[in-house]
Amino acid sequence: WLSTDYIFQCIQENCDFISLAGFTTNVKIPEVTGILLSDKTMINRIFTNLFSNILKYGDKGTPVIVRSSIRKQRFTVTVSNAIKQEHSDVGSSNIGLRNVQRMMQMMDGEMLLTKKTSSDSPGNHNISQNTSSAFASENVSGVFEVTLWFPLR
């Protein structure tokens, strides 16, 4: 059993790490906490994988947005970032994201991955208003968003 505070700590450590690489972050986490039926090692690996992808493919000119909430016995964390133009066509095995999804399932959680390219029409994808402004930079080819749902006890 873990407190949601542990996830906040993982998020903060990863945000600090990418800040050293030149990224800016916009983090909004409520002060409400809950108890998770989760594994510390898996939670740490999940956020390490997500933020490693941001380091590899993210656009430093657009803030990385992290939001969380607690509703209906679920703790939700959403991480979104803009994708650099030069990485828009880069092929990837997505092994890190597949591992994140597998770990979330092992903890009875869920993951939703959403990618919107600059050529997509507005409203066709599950992208929040905050991430849509990421297209302001001409070096950005799209927005990548991962939503994680952790069950609460």
Regions found by a protein language model. Name each.
Residues 17-27:
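Short conserved segments within the C-terminal catalytic ATPase subdomain
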Residues 104-105:
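Detector for a conserved hydrophobic position within an alpha-helical segment of the HATPase_c
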Residues 78-95:
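Glycine-rich/acidic phosphate-handling loop/turn and adjacent ATP-lid/helix
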Residues 35-38:
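Conserved micro-motifs of the catalytic ATP-binding
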Residues 43-44:
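A residue-level detector for a conserved hydrophobic packing site
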